[in-house]
């Protein structure tokens, strides 16, 4: 197992907190994805079910794969009343589809899937003409003073960790943006009909919940415990009572060409 994949398997340590503080995804995103490609849907790296719940609420049939047993347990509880959701405890790299899917989607996790096999596996899981939808949330403090204090604490205790301090920073919703993400992620030629969407929103959380949010991110999970405690303690002392966050959700679409 590579270092990247080890880092991608730390979320189960804080599965319940992850489910509590991680943001969901816009309802508009699910509508846009399902307008692009229909079910049945295969979800890769479902986590605790933030995206699963969104898509399941539309009535589409979802097979949700999640490699971490602790995360999958929360996912199963979250979707227990959804007969259209099947939870499978498996890494995508090891999952053997029993049928072809009209849609494969992945929220916040495609970068953890083995680069050597992920596109081949996606093509094998999709029916000809089936859609691939990859999306990520990025959030950062809306207040420059909060950002300055955030950066100062990181510089002191964890200078090698880069907190989110700004937007995604690439063209979205344009032909150039579609070409860029395909090139950046090594999308093979059997995928085409590219598209991108960007959804902007905001939310305000307590400083404690903002620190809890950071604690669910892999770059903080792998810190030494004393470093993490010093960093988070300083943030709790300096950020004030609440943190306003800007949120961007980037969606990338591709179709498995017949």
Regions inferred by a protein language model and the residue ranges of each:
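A short beta-strand submotif of the Rossmann-like class I SAM-dependent methyltransferase core
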Residues: 106-107, 115
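Conserved catalytic/acceptor-binding region of the Class I
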Residues: 128-200
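A short glycine-rich, Lys/Arg-flanked "PGG" loop and its adjoining helix->strand segment in the class I
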Residues: 118-128
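Class I SAM-dependent methyltransferase SAM/SAH-binding core
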Residues: 48-95
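A short acidic, Gly/Pro-enriched loop at the edge of an enzyme's catalytic core
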Residues: 96-104
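Conserved Class I S-adenosyl-L-methionine
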Residues: 48, 171-174, 179-258
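Conserved class I S-adenosyl-L-methionine
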Residues: 1-45
